């Protein structure tokens, strides 16, 4: 059996640009991509915390240290500057591999400052 698992997650990054006329993609500060193990041109899913929109695109490297999160092309209609996003990448692996897999999760402050990194998401309490 093959399972699709969370590979990397950027939690609550803020959109710094939205460029409708760029050819598509989401530009992400290279430091952020490294923190979550996201590669350039990798497929990503984006969840907009502010408006509930969910969409897929691909990552492109933004300038390292710039804190850029630029939603480009048609997806720019789904996110505005200042919106909070969760950006995820996924990986497929065997059931056996999945049972010991840990994602790379990066948590951010309101100004796109990396606050902490983790290899698990805390258990949600009732």
Curated annotation (Swiss-Prot):
This is Aspartate 1-decarboxylase. It is found in: Cytoplasm. The modification Pyruvic acid (Ser) is found at residue 25. It comes from the Bacteria. One of its GO terms (molecular function) is aspartate 1-decarboxylase activity. Catalyzes the pyruvoyl-dependent decarboxylation of aspartate to produce beta-alanine. Its main location: cytoplasm. Substrate binds at residues 57, 73-75. Pfam families: Asp_decarbox (PF02261). One of its GO terms (cellular component) is cytosol. PANTHER family: ASPARTATE 1-DECARBOXYLASE (PTHR21012:SF0). It catalyses: L-aspartate + H(+) = beta-alanine + CO2. Its EC number is 4.1.1.11. The active site is at residues 25, 58. InterPro entries: Asp_de-COase-like_dom_sf, Asp_decarbox. It is an enzyme of class 4 (lyase). The lineage of its organism: Bacteria, Pseudomonadati, Pseudomonadota, Gammaproteobacteria, Enterobacterales. Pathway: Cofactor biosynthesis; (R)-pantothenate biosynthesis; beta-alanine from L-aspartate: step 1/1. The keyword Lyase applies. GO terms for biological process: alanine biosynthetic process; pantothenate biosynthetic process. Heterooctamer of four alpha and four beta subunits. Binds 1 pyruvoyl group covalently per subunit.
């Amino acid at each position: 059996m093959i399972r699709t698992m969370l590979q990397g997650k950027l939690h609550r990054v803020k959109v710094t640009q939205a460029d409708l006329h760029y050819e598509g993609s989401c530009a992400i500060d290279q430091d952020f991509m490294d923190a979550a193990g996201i590669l350039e041109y990798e497929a990503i899913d984006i969840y907009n915390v502010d408006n509930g929109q969910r969409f897929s695109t691909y990552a492109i490297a933004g300038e390292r240290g710039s804190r850029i999160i630029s939603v480009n092309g048609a997806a720019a209609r789904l996110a505005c500057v200042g919106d909070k996003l969760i950006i995820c990448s996924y990986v497929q692996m065997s059931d056996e591999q999945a049972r010991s897999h840990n994602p790379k999760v990066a948590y951010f402050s309101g100004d796109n400052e990396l606050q902490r990194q983790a290899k698990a998401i805390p258990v949600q309490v009732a």
